[in-house]
């Protein structure tokens, strides 16, 4: 299955839609952030007491990021002309976020920081994806 195949994300993220119109774009953002945020929160509960200060701070910042709409991303998304290559890029980034969130689920405290940095980078890449 290609990285830009939405079936992978749909199989893991309930109600993952597409990027066809403004409403579906906002909904897709919400359900994806919710999915990632739930996995991050589970990690906080599971290994939070074992985290160093830097990792704990990064985790808290990402959980907060997942709770609220990224206004820069939504503004870009609302005004972007989403042709098929751009949608494929968004789906590939969404898949990366799903894969990373699933890895967080089983990560121990010492492995968590690198995963959190990768999630932060993936969220940044959503702001201006490059065509696949």
Can you describe what each PLM-predicted range is?
Residues 45-129:
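Charged linear interaction tracts used for macromolecular binding and regulation
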Residues 1-48:
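Leu/Val/Ala/Ile-rich N-terminal alpha-helices, chiefly Sec-type signal peptides and the beginnings
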């Amino acid at each position: 299955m290609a990285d830009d195949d939405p079936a992978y994300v749909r199989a893991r993220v309930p109600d993952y839609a597409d990027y066809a119109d403004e409403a579906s774009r906002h909904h897709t953002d919400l359900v994806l952030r919710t999915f990632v945020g739930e996995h991050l929160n589970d990690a906080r509960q599971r290994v939070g007491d074992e985290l160093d200060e830097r990792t704990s701070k990064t985790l808290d910042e990402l959980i907060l990021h997942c709770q609220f709409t990224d206004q820069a991303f939504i503004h870009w998304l609302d005004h972007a002309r989403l042709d098929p290559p751009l949608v494929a890029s968004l789906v590939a980034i969404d898949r990366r976020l799903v894969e990373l969130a699933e890895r967080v689920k089983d990560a121990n405290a010492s492995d968590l920081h690198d995963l959190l940095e990768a999630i932060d980078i993936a969220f940044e890449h959503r702001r201006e994806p490059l065509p696949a």
